[in-house]
Amino acid sequence: MSYFAFLSEHGPTMLLGTVTTIKVLVCSTILYVIISLIFGLMRLSKNPLIQGTATVYIEFFRGTSLLVQLFWFYYVLPFFGLTLEAFTAGVVAIGMNFGAYGAEIVRGGILAVPKGQWEGAFALNFTPAKRMRKIIIPQIFPIILPPAAN
């Protein structure tokens, strides 16, 4: 079978698979970014309940393989009354798994911001939320981009 005969026979199926893969990539990346920011900030909280919740989530999803998580989301959750379509189960499992790794990247990026930046924001009398939003978060993107894009 020649290349062109194979492509004419299986090309539409391969194209459909490529489009589905791109959809999963985009949706799980959006979920990954949201989870990473939320749980990365939760991990730095001084409240032990918030920090503990983030730690349990991160350690669970980093400690189990993605294949096991995909299996659980698609095959085991229906036993508990929560049935997800294959696409949704894949997006949620991949997003939550990568989000756990991303949360540690965000936490490390925040801790890598020089202490002088924190002190400068404190000297300007910024609230903790404004300090993060205006000073710290914009500075972490160059720090976290290489490990997050790897």
Residue ranges and their predicted role:
Residues 1-150:
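Transmembrane alpha-helices and adjacent helix-loop boundaries
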